[in-house]
Amino acid sequence: MTAPHDPLDDIQADPWALWLSGRTRTALELPHYRRAAVLVALTREADPRVLLTVRSSELPTHKGQIAFPGGSLDAGETPTQAALREAQEEVALDPAAVTLLGELDDVFTPVGFHVTPVLGRIAPEALDTLRVTPEVAQIITPTLAELRAVPLVRERRTLPDGTEVPLYRYPWRGLDIWGMTARVLHDLLEQGPG
C-alpha cells in the first residue's frame, strides 16, 4: 500500500515556493561585514512550524537569544551550504531532509554580520530527529499562526551612521524573539502566504 500523495511533496505546488518565485530578492553588498547564513526551516503542514533555537548561555556571543540555526560562512562556502551545515551541527538536522526553496532577502546586524536567510521545507517528522547540542539550550517550533497572533512590538534603532532601522519583537510563551531573527520572521509573516 502506498501513502497518499502529499501535494506539498511537489515543490511547484508549495505555496512558499510559489511566493518565493514571484518576488525579487534583496541582496546586499556589504564588503566589510562578516558573511553568515541561517536556515529558515518550515514544516510541510497547513500551519507550518518554524525551527528556532535558544542559544546556549555558554556561547561567547548572543547567549540565550532565539535564533535560526546558522552561522558564519566557511571559506569557499555558499550561504546554502553554510545554513545546512550549521543546522546539522546545531540541531542534528539531516541536510537531506530539507527541500531547499531559495534565499530570502539579505539582512545585516549592528555587530557587523551580513546574513543570507535560506528558506527550506521539512517534514513534520524531521522535528522528532532533532537534538540539542552544546551550542543550543532548547529547540522551539512555534507555528506561523501562533507568531501572527502575538502582539508584535515595533521599535526603531538609529545606527551610528544615522540610518534608522526597524526592530521587531515577538513575545512568545515567555520568550522574546527579537533582532535579526524577528526581522526575518516579520518579513515571512507579513509578506508570505497564509
Curated annotation (Swiss-Prot):
Provide any one GO MF term from the record. magnesium ion binding
Cofactor dependence:
Mg(2+); Mn(2+)
Q: What class of enzyme is it?
A: hydrolase
* SUPFAM superfamilies assigned: Nudix
Any GO BP annotation: coenzyme A catabolic process
> Keywords on this record?
Hydrolase, Magnesium, Manganese, Metal-binding
The protein's superkingdom reads: Bacteria
What is the annotated quaternary arrangement, including any partners?
Answer: Monomer.
| Protein name as catalogued | Nudix hydrolase DR_1184
Provenance organism = Deinococcus radiodurans (strain ATCC 13939 / DSM 20539 / JCM 16871 / CCUG 27074 / LMG 4051 / NBRC 15346 / NCIMB 9279 / VKM B-1422 / R1)
